[in-house]
Swiss-Prot record:
PROSITE patterns: G_ENGB. Belongs to the TRAFAC class TrmE-Era-EngA-EngB-Septin-like GTPase superfamily. EngB GTPase family. InterPro entries: G_ENGB_dom, GTP-bd, GTP-bd_ribosome_bio_YsxC, P-loop_NTPase, Small_GTP-bd. Transmembrane segments: none annotated. One of its GO terms (molecular function) is metal ion binding. Residues 27-198 form the EngB-type G domain. NCBIfam families: GTPase_YsxC, small_GTP. HAMAP family: GTPase_EngB (MF_00321). This is Probable GTP-binding protein EngB.
Length: 198
């Protein structure tokens, strides 16, 4: 359990960064969280940290436009990556986000693993697939977390999991976690898997 290693409730937003000159300058391990807009990234962060609104959840997707660094008990950081695939953002803006995300993922020595969130209800989007392929290409460790599991009857979980894995061309060596911020399904497994990568 995570509590044995760190006080998960001792968490705060540290800073927001647009480029590497703004990144924290130390060697704390970092876990990046990526996913398309409205996949439930903020809810995932809040559930893991046992907080209601540390990460701001928004009904307006595409709100996170910077890399948000969260300090967790001075032992590790979560890095909330801007949600991708939001239609109402201009192409220029999207390209800017893409560059910012890529710079962080490829150059950041502190980065230990990326939690890539997908919506359990649907097949992965082209952006989801592209993100997974990008991480595999650069050999960045990745955990797939399928959110909103409470919206799917348990009897259909296997079908949805198989479908997502097939579309992603999922590597069996990677972790796949079924998660719900509503009933906390996958909470312990998420922490155990993240900590095993640090």
């Amino acid at each position: 359990m995570a509590e044995e290693f760190l006080n998960t409730h001792n968490a705060s937003i540290l800073l927001s960064a647009a480029n590497k000159s703004h990144y924290p300058q130390d060697d704390l391990p970092e876990v990046a969280l990526a996913g398309r807009s409205n996949v439930g990234k903020s809810s995932f962060i809040n559930t893991l940290l046992g907080r209601k609104n540390l990460a701001r959840t928004s009904s307006k997707p595409g709100k996170t436009q910077l890399l948000n660094f969260y300090n967790i008990d001075d032992k590790l950081r979560f890095v909330d990556v801007p949600g991708y695939g939001y239609a109402k953002v201009s192409k220029t803006e999207r390209a800017k986000w893409g560059k910012m995300i890529e710079e962080y993922l490829v150059t950041r020595d502190n980065l230990r693993v990326v939690v890539s969130l997908v919506d359990f209800r649907h097949d992965p989007s082209a952006d989801d697939i592209q993100m997974y392929e990008f991480l595999k290409y650069y050999e960045i460790p990745v955990i797939i977390v399928a959110t909103k599991a409470d919206k799917i009857p348990r009897g259909k979980w296997n079908k949805h999991e198989s479908s997502i894995k097939k579309k992603l061309n999922f590597d069996k060596k990677d972790h796949f976690i079924v998660f719900s911020s509503v009933d906390r399904t996958g909470l312990d497994e998420s922490w155990d898997t993240i900590l095993s990568e640090l």
